[in-house]
Structure formats: C-alpha cells, structure tokens
C-alpha cells in the first residue's frame, strides 16, 4: 500500500462548494474529472498525440521549455567544470478524463513515452470540477487493448504544482536556476500575457511589460511552503508589479528527476538513486529538508493559505477577453493567458485551430460568484472545446498595493 496516498482529514474545498452550489441550481452540471498534464520532449510529441487521438479525448497543447543544469569539464585539462543552463523545447498536453480512468491513462502514457526513464518528461493529474458541453469520456476498448504496465510503485502522491507568474524579462531563467540549485525539480518555463497588476500601478505601468514568463514547479507537498518563501526572496516578488504565485494540489504524478546533464561518475545516476529511494519509502516524505517554522516570517502576511481557487478558462480568442475581465471585475487576484492548440479525436469536427487558456486566481469567498458570471456569458452549451475548470489553490502570494 502506498503510504502517501492514504486519506487524511478532510479540509475545506472551494471546488466542492462550487459543485454543490451548481448542482442545487440545476442549470449546469459540473463534471468531477481529473486533469492530466503531460510535459514531454517535443521529439516524443507525435507518440503522445497519436495515443490521445485514439483515446478520443480533446487535449490542449502549449509550447514551453525545460531548464536543466549542464556541466562540462574545462578545456586543456584545467581543474573544475563549466556550468551553464540547457533549454529543451517541450510540448505540454492538458486534457481531462473521468477520475476512475486516471491511473490507467497515466500508466499508458508512461508506457508510450517511456516516462519512467529520467529526462523524457513529467506527467501528473489534478482532481477538479469541469464545466463543458459534454462529459469527458475515453475509448475504454482502446485503453484495455493498450495493456500498459502498472507503475504504482513509482507514481508519487502528496505533490504540489507551484506556478510563478513573473513580469520581468529573463526572470524565468533566473528563478529556474534557483530551483535547480535547491534540487526541487526540472523547471518548466512558458510564456503568456497578463495585465491585472499592471493596470493598477498608474504611471509606473509603462515600465512593466504585459508579457509574462511562467515557471511551473512540481514538488513534494511538505516542502512547498518553505520553497515558495525562498523563491519569493530570490525573485523579489515582494515588490509591486513583479508577479504572483499560486499553488495547486497534485493527486498523483511522475516528475522528471534529470536535473543535471553531464558525465556520469558513478555506477548509478543521482536520478536513479532518488527514484529507488522514492519506491522504497513509498513517497517523497524522506526528501524533506526545509523547516517552514524556521524560515523568514516577514512575508507571512502576504502568503494566503486560505483556500483560493484556480479558475481556468479555455475559449476562442474573440471571447476570452470578455470572460477574463468578468473575473477580474469581481475580485480575482491575478490572471495570465497563453495560446493553446486543441488536439481533437478523429470524430471531432468544427474545432478552432488556436484557442486561449486563461488561468485566474480567485479568493474562495467569491469563487461561486465568479463561476456564475462565467457560465452566464460563456458559450459552453454551444462549443465542444470550451472549458471552465475549478481547482483548489490552498496558497497564493501577490503583492498588495496600499
């Protein structure tokens, strides 16, 4: 039995509150689903795309890059090494499946892309509420025929996905290097646009670009608060207009552990050793190195652990601005948008070639109000690719203007 997957005490969940509220109203029926995120080397994208087409799901693809540390020996046999950052182009696949099929789909993708080998990619799932025209489903016959291995021994639980939305050009690579130095994970860097904080800064807004660099880190849940505090200091997110952070829970996943590229000095790589200990210890609890109680407390007032929500909207470019502005008008604390390409199955028709995914951080007390407004003005009942996702976000940080 996986020790880290055993249920703990129940905590307040804004997404469950939204589900109960919308079910009682009876206008829209939210679907309890798992969103699977697969971050894959672009050379392997065709394999994953082919599998998802056969599976019959609608996936949304975003481009990004993974950052690793590369170590090379100095020329002319000089002592020491040359250390630099290496960027690898990746494709990010996001799609939803019924929760009961999550593990089987993850096992199959690990098989197809050989994600059990470090350096090939990361996959994880998050339980959330989805509003869409059709309830997500998968081709069960195809899934049964895939006959994948059971990777329960290496799948990790009690993880967190922490998203850093940064306003300064080049700050994404700087933060990625800090994450690599801490040995957290392989950072994923993507690009988007956002103007929430910029619109509130008056004349100083001309110095802040609407273009954002977004750093995604998948890490053990027990270290997430301490790591967030350290990285806030590194990126100086306690200054106005520098960006915002939010954290979301991960139900299960297999993070890439190949943080450093270089000559192998021992019989096993550090990635293989970490994977073996994770398997023996049935989780990542043994990795805990940081004690939150002894971290600097001066930013505690701005780190909000009071149950926020991430609301993700996927829609056509012509409609997304109206939907996003509706969220910001009622009190959302941050928004960032990126272009995605929908990947639909063979029987899907009338699919737009490009769409926009906008992720918005919303305080728990207004989540239901925001969802009501989005459902009122959205085209979910008409467009099969439009989505609204409501996901718990137990902690967020944004600089508050006085």
Give residue ranges: language-model regions:
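Positively charged, small/polar-rich N-terminal and surface patches that mediate targeting and assembly
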Residues: 2-402
